[in-house]
Amino acid sequence: MQPQLHQEITRRLLADFSFKEQGDWLRQGVCPDCQKKELYTYAISPWVLRCGRLNKCNAEIHIKEVYPDLFESWSDRYPPTPENPQAAADAYLREMRGFDLSLLRNCYAQENYYDARRDLGSATVRFPLADGVWWERIVDRPQRFGDRKANFHGAYSGLWWQLPTLKLEEQQEIWLVEGIFDAIALHHHGIAAVSLMTCNNYPAQALSQLAALFVDKKRPLLVWALDNDKAGMNYTRRWVKRSRDDGWLSTAAQTPYSRTKLDWNDLHQRDRLNPDLIKKYRYYGSLLIAPNPNAKALLMHERTERKEFHFEFDSRLYWFKLDIDRYMRAFDNVMYNGKEELDEEEAKHKALQESAAVVEIANCYPTTLYYQANTITDESWYYFRINFPDDTPPIKNTFTGSQLSSGSEFKKRLLHIAQGGIFTGTSQQLDKLLLKQLPKIKTVQTTDFIGYSKEYRAYVFNDLAVRDGRLYTLNEEDFFDMGKLSLKSLNQSVSLTLNDNLKQMDSQWPQLLWQAFGAKGFVALAYWFGTMFAEQIRDKHKSFPFLEIVGEPGSGKTTLIEFL
């Protein structure tokens, strides 16, 4: 970590989390998730904050998530010099991505991107893929460019990116990931990896060239390790099948699921790419590409040795149960009376196939997202996402505590909120499902209105929220994630459509208001503007005035009010 950055991060950590300095460590900080003084980090390079309550909290937060402002304006912090014209690119890769630059020499360059429509520019880190084909990442406050974070030039379909120093002809195994930074991250841990650039790019041309290197020897194993979002998982299954049809030995690997989605570069920065964890990620990949529910259940049992458990397959809920007596009889029969000569592990696997029962207990898959509470009304709900097979869009809705208390009540509520969703399991099976899901969920605070919440010091609307001068958008789970605060509005009656693009504001409307209503219109406008701060004004001055708009019929009272 660069000394200036280290000094600023340390200063903020001591002030914001009440850490105590103990040798090479910062300890006894207040965990933002559980509020206990169990947070710690390595003082010499405080990249990751971790909670010491492994079983009850186990929070893990990268410093980029805590202080994003320190990882945005790379050109300002590291301007180019005659000695190092690509200082910003170097700093971005070193500090933002956690890479050892000695492994990346001569494979990237610092360039510039200019958006004429927005009249904005930024430095970029550019990686060549082939002659006339390159990809670059915007590094200076990329949020200014909307959804654009990177640029492509040239046709990359069928190709992949690889480190210039990577000798594919010497590899027994090659990982195929989405992003260039993911491939570089795996390279730091001795894993040969190439980048497809996007999950839907099947590298047919690159694989053909690779096959030519292995004409007289065994081809390497392909490990498809795309992102763990919906698109990444769908294409992992698709490309594994296609590559096998093309004559390749193929399997998969998956990053672990977490509320904050992590890619391979994120895991590299969190020191979570050691050999034992890599085995676990390959296990996740095997589960993803399992051909049927039985195969997936057997994989899970062989790893966990649990005799009974629920699992998901194709967005349906299944239940696995092992009949021990039947298993022992099947094992003895296979091991000692079978026609095939099998070792003990092979006999166990075959006995499992004969003695395990897999039953579908719901034709959809319910996932508890979070617990939402209204402290004023003392009401609470569990917010669920219900996934369906066959690409049917998921639905999200609430369950009360009583609706989760028995299988029959759960079935009624599921039928009510999810068309065609049926739960056929028992109350005991539901209890075990909830015991697995509920302890891990977070709590989301709620308001029953839209507007300013005095309690949470935030403006909460339908799709946007503002707190401490920062704008937040509703996330995929229908709440506003504001760091230590998670918040949503329960209001369903008032719907406001707000535009957060300030450059699209039409500044002519005040003139039209003046032409139509004159000074009285501006008095009403000033009052309306003041209502945005009514709670703050009441807090300081004890009250906020009323405004009465009166006039002759047809004088425009309703028009003025509706406009405002």
What are these regions (language model features)?
Residues 1-76, 83-122, 126-129, 208-211:
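N-terminal structured subdomain of primase-like DNA metabolism proteins
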Residues 34, 276-489:
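N-terminal nucleic-acid engagement/recognition segments and initiation subdomains in replication
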Residues 478-564:
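P-loop NTPase catalytic core of nucleic-acid-dependent motor ATPases
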Residues 51, 93, 127, 178, ...:
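Terminal peptide-recognition signature
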